[in-house]
C-alpha cells in the first residue's frame, strides 16, 4: 500500500486555505519505517501547497504512540493541546418535550445558517471553505444535517449531527455550538438531548464526542448528559 493510500485509509484529513489537519482514525499498527514515510510525505505536501500550519493528532492509546512522538519531534512538530474523547449510548434516548425548536438549513436559508455558524463557532472561514469542510466531513447530503436551534424567535445554537464515514452506527456532532449570550440559561441539556435524538433517528446507536480538555463548558454538558470518558488525543503543529 502506498503512503497516500495509507493516509486516505487510516487517517482523517481536513484542509482549509492555510492549514491541513491529519488525524489518526483507527488503531492500525504501522512499522517505524511506514510512520517515517507518512511524516515525510505530509511535510513535503504541506511545503508544496505552501500552507501555514500542518496539524497532526494522535490518540493516547495508539499502538504507534511512541513512534509517532519520535517522528513528530524529528520533523519539528510542537505540542499544542490535548482533547478528550467521550462516548454515550443513545439506544434509550427519547424525544422529550422542549421549548427548543430545531430547523433545517432549508428552512432558515444557507446565508442565515452560515452567519450563525460563524458567530457561534468563531471560525474565520469563507463560505466556500465552509462548504468544502461539510463536503469532506459529511458528503453531498450535508445540508440535510445542518440544524439551528431556537427558543421562540431567538436563535440559541447550531448543531450538525451525522453518522461517521465508514461507521454504520457511530453518531457525531460536527458542531454543537450555543450562542455566548444564551449559555448557562438552562438550554444546554435539552439542546444536547435533542441532538442525540436526531442522531438516533438517522441510525446511530452511540455517540462519540471530542473536546479540548480546557473547554469546561462542554465538559459540563457531557457530564450532565451521562457521557463516559474513553481516551484522549494530542495535537501537534508544524508551522511553515
Predicted ranges, named:
Residues 1-51, 55-60, 159-180:
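Conserved donor-binding loop and adjoining core beta-sheet/short helix segment
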Residues 13, 127-178:
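A conserved beta-strand-loop-helix scaffold within acyl/acetyltransferase catalytic domains
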Residues 32-44, 178, 184-201, 220-224:
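Conserved acetyl-CoA-binding loop-helix of GNAT-fold acetyltransferases
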Residues 34-99, 233-238:
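Acyl-donor-binding surface of acyltransferase catalytic domains
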Residues 52, 205, 228:
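Short acidic/polar active-site loop segments enriched in Thr and Asp
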Residues 68-72, 221-223, 227:
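Conserved active-site tyrosine of GNAT-family acetyltransferases
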Residues 96-128:
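Short amphipathic alpha-helix that is part of the acyltransferase structural core
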Residues 210:
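Long, contiguous binding/interaction regions
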